[in-house]
Each structure stands twice: as C-alpha cells, then as structure tokens.
C-alpha cells in the first residue's frame, strides 16, 4: 500500500512517547489506519487519535495493537495506559496547511454553527467526549474529489 500516514517527530515535539513506537510499527507493517481500525474494532479517526495520543486506548485496544503491530504489550501498556494529555500536540494557530484549514473552518463558521445549534437544541454545547467523527471520500461527476467530515456529539 502507498501513501500511508507517517510521523516526523521533529514536527510534533509534544506527542507522547507511544506515538513514535506506534507509527514506526505501522510503517513496518505497511498498514493504513483503516486496516488497523478494522483489527481493533474502532473507526479510523478514533484509531488515528490513539496514535497521536489524543484518545484513550482501552486495555483491549492495546492488546490488539500489540498483536497486529508486533509490539510488546507491556511496553504499550506502560506508555498508553494512562490518560491522554489532549490538545497539546499542535501549536496554535497550526502551521500544517490541512490542520490550519480545519482551524480556519472553525474561525469562519464557528459562530454560524453555534447559532444554528442553539436554535435547534437550545442553550448548551456539543460534547467532544461523547463524540464520534468520520471521514469519507466523494467523487463528483466531473471527477473532483471531495472530503466529507462528519461530527456527531451529544448535546
């Protein structure tokens, strides 16, 4: 498989130690996040978030990752068994162009989203804990590729 996501640790100095271990093993196994997600029983975004240290891996996730990536389960458990330190992995504003575009979407549409959500649901917030997200690829009739990012959060 080609075009697999990899990790340049010099670009991500705040990621947990487990990130390097997981990304190196992912590259050696030549696996996509979709393939890894199927093995551990999660969606691919949640799986990638585990690799970046932004989601909590369950004991079962750690065992399945160790098995698939041929890593010592005890080493993974030591590095991933605690609680994630979310939100520290990226400088703000982000410099990476795709991450910046996502940031820009929130800058441009954040208050519009808030207004519509408040009108539909009343006062409150959308959870980022009771949350799921998915990425799909769509190709239109002209052959242009479109990214579809779905976010689902408890109100």
UniProtKB/Swiss-Prot annotation:
Query: What terms describe the molecular function in GO for this protein?
Result: cyanate hydratase activity; DNA binding
Question: Gene3D superfamilies this protein is in?
Answer: Cyanate lyase, C-terminal domain, lambda repressor-like DNA-binding domains
E.C. number(s) listed in UniProt:
4.2.1.104
The EC category is lyase
Q: Which InterPro entries match?
A: Cyanase (IPR008076), Cyanate_lyase_C (IPR003712), Cyanate_lyase_C_sf (IPR036581), Lambda_DNA-bd_dom_sf (IPR010982)
Residues of the active site: 101, 104, 127
Question: Which example biological process does GO assign this protein?
Answer: cyanate metabolic process
- Tell me the keywords, alphabetical order: Lyase
Q: Does the keyword Lyase apply?
A: yes
Record's catalysed reaction(s): cyanate + hydrogencarbonate + 3 H(+) = NH4(+) + 2 CO2
One Pfam family hit? Cyanate_lyase
NCBIfam families reported in the protein's UniProt record = cynS (TIGR00673)
Q: What does this protein do?
A: Catalyzes the reaction of cyanate with bicarbonate to produce ammonia and carbon dioxide.
Which family is this sequence assigned to? Belongs to the cyanase family.
Q: Give the protein name, as stated in the record.
A: Cyanate hydratase
| Organism of provenance | Coccidioides posadasii (strain C735)
